Amino acid sequence: MPCTTILVGKKASHDGSTIIARNDDGRFEAKRVLAHPAREKATTYKTVISHLTVELPGNAMRYTDCPNVSKSNGVWPACGINEANVAMTATETITSNARVVGADPYVRYQEKKGRNTKEVPGGIGEEDLVTLVLPYIHSAREGVLRPGAL
């Protein structure tokens, strides 16, 4: 079964709760639920897979996410909800759609090989989107616009 997410907004749930339910495709990966505090200061985030460093602004909202327990293959925070009550999922495996890749090709990580070459960081991958987007958005519209602003 492919990755599937069900989002229920506060106006659709019986008690006003925001609910997110999600499954992952592929092999079993243990997940955990984390609550990240709000952060006032700017910081940087380094992606595990593509080795890209991204500057993050201050005023990050408090949010939850569900990353893999092991970070060896990337963080993969599959879903989360922020303090503005915006829910997000991002790892719906965009890699399998050739039309998307044709319109927006990957910027692939290139490892340093030898003394005369440099490491070339890759682009932002689906495994980093929740971390880079969710703490900074107040609506679904902002969630669509933020990745393009990165």
Language model features: what each stretch is:
Residues 128-129, 138:
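Intrinsically disordered, low-complexity acidic segments that are enriched in bulky aromatics
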